[in-house]
Amino acid sequence: MAKPTEIPGLEPGTPLSVAGPLLVRARLDDVRRYEAAAVGTGEGEPDVDAVHDMRIASRRLRAALQLFGRGDLAALEDEVKALQDALGEVRDGQVQRRWFERHARKQDGGGRLAAWAGGGLPRASKRLRRAIRGWQGAVAPSIARAAEDAAGKGRLQGKRLAKEVRARLATLKRRLAAARDARSPRKVHRLRIAAKKLRYVAELVEPGFPGAAKGMLAALVPLQERLGDLHDTDVRIERLERLARRGQRRERRAARATLAVLHEERAREARALRRELSRWREERVVRALRRGFSRGGRRVKLRVKVAAAANGHAADAPAA
């Protein structure tokens, strides 16, 4: 996953009236970087990596609009969400097809399932090309013009941004508790979304809270990896269960055989997630992270042992 563009000169004392427009423009440029590759050539399928990176960049742009947007700029977030959704439709199809292609080597019928998983990609790719044309023609230029409105009172290390981070942490804490047994795909997915949103905000406020934000990003890496693995498996199970009921005879047989493998895989991934959630509770990770954004925004050294560091993870690990 590509890192967000760094902006030289931003520091804890930088006014939001300066930092806000710079961060919004940087996040906008990050999205635009992938336009050509994500459109593809002719009627062909878009580049897999470009779709992935552009989707993440669009999420980061939405986070910037939520944090700094006002007036017309804030209203453009829905347009960015529409682009993100079009990218997500293609990305999900590509991810699922790739898994079934690999699985096809191990089990009869896997090739048939790979074709089924990628069956919607031509239509999704067409919708994505249409969405990118709209983005290029109207949405991106509008964000560029309105970026100057991304202001607000205070500094990068001020109370306002610290409060925003604490609010995201509170949401994460609630969803950690709700998903603690890792049984419900819906609750796991909601936790995954909360972790993503917290990550993208932490990236934005890192120049103001460098120590606290780096600790937060590192702590989120192993959690997001476990959540991502389990979510992808849950999506496969849901779709295959539907195919096992409604597909053609050979498809139903292949789907049932693959479902047995997937349920075993989900059990392993759920155990791994439960271990990570248990670690967060035992080490009071949320409480430790919150301290870095408390006391009026002053830096506080985190006392949490970050598993990401112990396992050799980097804070920029995939968070798709």
Show where each model-derived region lies.
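Function-determining surface determinants
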Residues: M1-A320
